[in-house]
């Protein structure tokens, strides 16, 4: 499962993360994955791939998945990539708390993502927030 914006989850535990850094028209992509052992994370449950697959088998799987998604991103409407992300994300309606970079905390229900990847958060009173940066708690 994917947790916005960049966490990779396995059975509700953080397995890894995806980082993107843009410079001009180029983007560097980094993947961090707990292959052999789950680290101790304060306030967060972590997972590793060791019980799911052999660590040496992971690189070809990652390379193939990344190549497919990169092709989708380059050759199609960005909304198709957003839809592909949603099929692997926490379900619409999941209760979330977002801690923004401005030390603001907002809570509501996951309402999808925008075409540019921003999080849609529906507050309890019905208003919709579009979140472009922050840390999400499930």
How should these model regions be labeled?
Residues 2-6:
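Alpha/beta catalytic cores of group-transfer enzymes, especially the acyltransferase/condensing modules
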Residues 10-138:
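Long, positively charged amphipathic alpha-helical accessory segments at protein N-termini or as interdomain linkers
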